[in-house]
């Protein structure tokens, strides 16, 4: 392997010099071809020499003429490979020099052999003393030296990997690629001038050995190197996948997964690393959706995607086989960087496959298997490929928005209520009195809709999913997707009992839309003051896009979220924070009407949220005390989310006072939530579930205190009482829409 010193000192210009000479050799062969065609080959083609001997000579002369042509092809390819090698080595050496310079700038010394050490000559006296007597300082120096050494060693290793690729290319370029051309070990008429294409051919050969179970440890090491060294290289990626084809790609992926998870788990890291390399190759090869390769590979995958494959060890059930798209998405989950178009096309093709299967008369999903695939040990397999590709898509919020926008397509409708999500064959129905096995009875998998929920979250917030999002400017398509989701769930009677695994992502989403949900419940402007059963609208202004939907539609979805107490607690806490901000934004010196209007808005909105909470307490399905504890935990998490809105301390010119007030309020509020949860679920008690009103009172007192008024003053009490009727209005109307028995 090349050393650091060799990498830094080798005269790379010799490669371009050699390339020029190989170009010159190609020109000489061209001259010889011209002379041979004129002086030898032309004789056999004329009229003066005829008969068997002429025919025999002509065929031999044709072979020789082609050899002159092939020699030119090979010489030009060698020249191109030399220039390719030169470009690679120059680039890699440049990275190594850059790392060395950065290390020196960071206080390191790098020897001619690439050994990193701490440069003590530049230290001040104080730094020298610390190095001599401070163990922590010495440890930090040691770690820094080690980090720089690892970086430089890896860059030298990258040169070694590139050197191996060059070696592979030069060994292959001189091999006669046509054994039927009349020569043995002749010139290579199909020689290529791209190192990566020869590396792809090497990777294909190893992949075939992997599939057949004949790969050696050296093969696996080389395949890892090939994927690492060519990560992001289009020529390598397309050549390899073209050679393997869609089926070959899936076979390789399945074999690697079997080895990693079942057959050779001690070496699982090796196989998963190769699998990641294959996924990167797929992402690179499909990055340009307008390329000939893209159309060719997609066409192949449409066919292979519904075919059945063996994945050894996946299922304890004999003869269980998986579909191609399940294997494809399992592979894709190992990588990243896929183009948005490839993700959308894959999702479209998977949907087409399942719709075609249903149209053919099948009652079960095309992806149905006799086992579930959830949890750490099983969840890696994408048994639901559409949900899987949506999960990948969620990492690209712009693509998620485009894919789910109801103004562009019907994908959102399909996913919300048009799709069969049952992918697990629970059992087979047997006709009464019969002895034959009937049709399969399928159920949802444990991680059903997790990918869809993540994509929905990304599509409506413009942010990667998985956490609560700050309030931000939304686009019209983002708001339109959320509006359509709320209306569709409500119309399909799925709002109050949300489809499995949608509650948490919807809570994440609605937190980001708290100003709009506050406006809907408060009816704070004509845009929000709409019929309670209205499908609403979406509009935009200087602050971005907004949405409004009917009060009872929004409340129904929030009631569905409230089955997850922590998720609903976070929504509740977000409303508390926003209500704080509404009051904090009241101008100094504002009149009583302005103040009262803000208090009324906050009271009405908080009343609506509390109506949802009261409905949960009224519902006998829940262990109320635990629900209340989890709900309080969600509120606490929400209030500790930094900069979701302006900090609560902004309410006061002396932030500590306001913070202490909020702390006391939160403590008392939590006790009231738990106390209410322990009351019997009767209509009389339901009318007294008013801890939320106390939350509003604490809110108003904190605001008044921030403006210099005692929390029990007449001024403060006036505004505390101003919103009580409106709190009751929001709470009771919400509870009435949720409970027909009131």
Cite the ranges covered by each PLM segment.
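N-terminal secretion-targeting helices of virulence/extracellular proteins
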Residues: 1-182, 735, 739-742
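Non-catalytic all-alpha helical scaffold/repeat segments
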Residues: 179-738
């Amino acid at each position: 392997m090349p050393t650091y010193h060799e990498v830094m000192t080798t005269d790379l210009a010799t490669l371009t010099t050699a390339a020029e000479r190989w170009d010159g050799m190609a020109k000489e062969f061209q001259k010889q071809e011209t002379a041979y065609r004129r002086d030898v080959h032309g004789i056999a083609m004329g009229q003066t020499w005829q008969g068997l001997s002429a025919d025999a000579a002509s065929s031999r002369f044709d072979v020789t003429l082609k050899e002159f042509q092939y020699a030119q092809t090979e010489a030009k390819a060698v020249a191109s490979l030399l220039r390719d090698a030169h470009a690679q080595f120059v680039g890699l050496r440049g990275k190594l020099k850059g790392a060395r310079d950065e290390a020196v700038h960071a206080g390191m010394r790098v020897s001619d052999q690439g050994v990193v050490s701490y440069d003590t000559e530049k230290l001040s006296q104080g730094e020298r003393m610390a190095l001599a007597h401070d163990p922590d300082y010495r440890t930090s120096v040691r770690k820094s030296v080690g980090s720089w050494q690892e970086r430089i060693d890896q860059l030298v290793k990258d040169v070694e990997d590139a050197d191996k690729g060059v070696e592979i290319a030069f060994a292959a370029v001189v091999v006669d690629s046509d054994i039927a051309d009349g020569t043995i070990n002749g010139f290579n008429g199909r020689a290529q001038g791209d190192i990566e294409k020869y590396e792809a051919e090497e990777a294909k050969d190893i992949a075939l050995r992997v599939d057949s179970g004949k790969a050696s440890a050296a093969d696996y090491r080389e395949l890892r190197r090939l994927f690492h060294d060519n990560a992001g290289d289009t020529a390598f990626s397309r050549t390899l996948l073209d050679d393997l084809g869609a089926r070959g790609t899936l076979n390789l992926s399945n074999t690697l997964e079997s080895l990693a998870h079942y057959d050779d788990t001690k070496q699982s890291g090796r196989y998963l690393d190769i699998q990641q390399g294959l996924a990167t190759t797929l992402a690179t090869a499909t990055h340009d959706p307008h390329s000939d390769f893209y159309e060719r590979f997609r066409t192949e995958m449409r066919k292979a995607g519904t075919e059945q494959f063996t994945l050894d060890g996946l299922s304890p059930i004999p003869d269980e086989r998986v579909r191609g798209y399940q294997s494809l998405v399992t592979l894709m989950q190992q990588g990243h960087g896929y183009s948005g178009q490839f993700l959308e096309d894959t999702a479209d093709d998977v949907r087409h496959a399942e719709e075609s299967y249903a149209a053919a008369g099948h009652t079960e999903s095309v992806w149905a298997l006799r086992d579930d695939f959830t949890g750490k040990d099983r969840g890696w397999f994408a048994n639901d490929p559409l949900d899987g590709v949506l999960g990948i898509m969620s990492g690209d919020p712009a693509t998620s928005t485009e894919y789910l926008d109801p103004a562009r397509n019907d994908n959102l409708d399909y996913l919300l209520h048009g799709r069969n999500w049952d992918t697990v064959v629970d059992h087979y129905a047997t006709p009464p009195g019969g002895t034959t096995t009937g049709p399969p009875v399928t159920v949802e998998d444990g991680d059903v809709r997790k990918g869809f929920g993540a994509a929905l979250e990304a599509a409506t917030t413009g942010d990667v999913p998985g956490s609560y999002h700050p309030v931000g400017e939304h686009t019209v398509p983002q708001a339109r997707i959320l509006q359509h989701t709320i209306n569709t769930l409500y119309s399909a009677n799925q709002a109050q009992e949300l489809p499995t695994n949608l509650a948490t992502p919807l809570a994440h989403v609605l937190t980001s839309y708290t100003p709009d949900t506050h406006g809907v419940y408060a009816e704070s402007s004509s845009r929000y003051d709409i019929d309670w059963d209205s499908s609403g609208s979406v509009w935009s202004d200087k602050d971005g896009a907004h949405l409004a939907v009917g009060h009872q539609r929004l409340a129904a979805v929030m009631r569905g979220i409230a089955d997850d107490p922590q998720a609903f607690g976070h929504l509740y806490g977000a409303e508390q924070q926003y209500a704080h901000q509404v009051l904090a934004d009241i101008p100094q010196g504002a009149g009583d009407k302005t103040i009262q209007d803000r208090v009324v808005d906050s009271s009405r909105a908080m009343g609506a949220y509390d109506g949802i909470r009261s409905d949960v307490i009224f519902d006998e399905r829940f262990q109320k005390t635990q629900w209340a504890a989890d709900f309080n935990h969600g509120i606490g998490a929400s209030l500790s989310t930094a900069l979701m809105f302006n900090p609560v301390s902004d309410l006061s010119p002396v932030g500590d006072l306001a913070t202490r007030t909020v702390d006391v309020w939160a403590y008392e509020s939590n006790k009231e939530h738990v106390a209410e949860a322990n009351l019997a679920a009767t209509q009389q008690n339901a009318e007294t579930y008013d801890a939320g009103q106390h939350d509003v009172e604490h809110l108003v007192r904190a605001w008044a205190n921030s403006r210099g008024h005692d929390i029990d003053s007449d001024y403060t009490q006036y505004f505390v009482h101003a919103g009580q009727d409106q709190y009751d209005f929001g709470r009771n109307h919400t509870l009435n829409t949720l409970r027909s028995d009131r």
